[in-house]
Amino acid sequence: MEMGRRIHSELRNRAPSDVKELALDNSRSNEGKLEALTDEFEELEFLSKINGGLTSISDLPKLKLRKLELRVSGGLEVLAEKCPNLTHLYLSGNKIKDLSTIEPLKQLENLKSLDLFNCEVTNLNDYGENVFKLLLQLTYLDSCYWDHKEAPYSDIEDHVEGLDDEEEGEHEEEYDEDAQVVEDEEGEEEEEEGEEEDVSGGDEEDEEGYNDGEVDGEEDEEELGEEERGQKRK
């Protein structure tokens, strides 16, 4: 489908000014340019234009875009002028071979996240560290977090693994604490059961002693009776 027809289809009877997201992936671009996308899309915040033969974004209107997914061979200098509010830029699979191609992105002061997956530039030595040196405003590169004050790009994975280990350690401590609580509760229950057994055992002994006393008393009475009868016979 041609890009113009695709835009008309995505409008769904809405005015361009009411549209905040627009996905034009796989729509054909006549002469490799954007078409039918005008500054009437004044509230547009997300635009995706992947595949479809786009070779230039020189006719991109000025927009409030915050997120842009783009498959284009060059001309990124246009973005700083036309989309100054960009915070997320996805350029995966583009023919970007060196850092000079993305150097114009320095002008995007609000840019926080950049994706260059499957671009040749990612094969350069110290690729990540050099990108962050070039684009100081970035926080994420290829979905990896970066803190300019902490560690070099090469240590990001170790940093993330360390966070995972800390979380596991916290979970283990919580488990140990819970296990200790359970053990303490079980110990208290055993002590209570032991006390109950002692009490019941004591009661049983008292009852046995009482019964023995009754038997002895009866035997004594019988002996006294026999003695009295013997004396009377005499």
UniProtKB/Swiss-Prot annotation:
GO biological process terms, semicolon-separated: nucleocytoplasmic transport; regulation of apoptotic process
Claim: Cell membrane is one of the keywords in the record: no
Residue stretches spanning the membrane: none
Tissues with expression: Expressed in activated stem cells, such as mobilized CD34+ cells and cord blood CD34+ cells, but not in resting bone marrow CD34+ cells. Expressed in a variety of neoplastic cell lines, mainly in prostatic adenocarcinoma cell lines. Not expressed in normal prostatic tissue.
Keywords: Leucine-rich repeat, Repeat
Membership in a protein family: Belongs to the ANP32 family.
Span list, region Disordered: 161-234
First and last residues of every LRR repeat: 44-63, 64-84, 85-107, 111-134
Highest taxon above the source species: Eukaryota
Protein name: Putative uncharacterized protein ANP32CP
Organism listed in the record: Homo sapiens (Human)
